[in-house]
Amino acid sequence: MPICLKGDERRVKLLFVNACPRGEDSRTLRLARTFLNALTALLPQCEVTEEALYPAGLTPVDAALLARKEALCDRRAWDDPLFAPAVRLQAADLVVIAAPYWDLSFPSALKLWVEHCYVRSLTFHYEGSRCVGMCRGSQAVYLTTAGSPIGENDWGAGYMQAVLKALGVARFTALSAQGLDLAENDAGALLGEAMARAAALAEEIAGNEKARPI
């Protein structure tokens, strides 16, 4: 339901990309909900749209789908359902991605989402040989949890930062809870500490959004 705003409050569109296969049992999703609850409490004009990737069942981009996509791009047929994820990304002021740390990166559904969001003349265009992003977002937040330490193998966050930067979202913050499955660690305490950092990050971002000119 649209939020009714008072006075000169600026509506903030937030896209929440939920790439958590375990649903509400996911520790990553719990971390994300903590962040989103804190942010929307501080920024009541924030409108959250959730892109739940597992019920979405995005189709892998094969040769036939790629040909259809290119033809639709040529016609700028942005109302075609194929472009719905890209349209939502392009319009978002804030992008929040929740994805568990799997196999040195993230679940495959998130890569499918990226493939559906790279849309010529909608989320990016070319100036000569240079790719220029067209998304309006000012900030992206990437939230993840890992059973083991991630260390230098943070390929998922690094990849998503590069993708979003290419599409025009320059500011990127990654936040994680790591080592949750190690016997010597207190998983609850580690997750709780990450949730506290998530709430603090939400406060920082809410302050930045309130300071932006209307």
Residue map of PLM features:
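Short, well-ordered secondary-structure micro-motifs
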Residues: 61-64, 153, 185
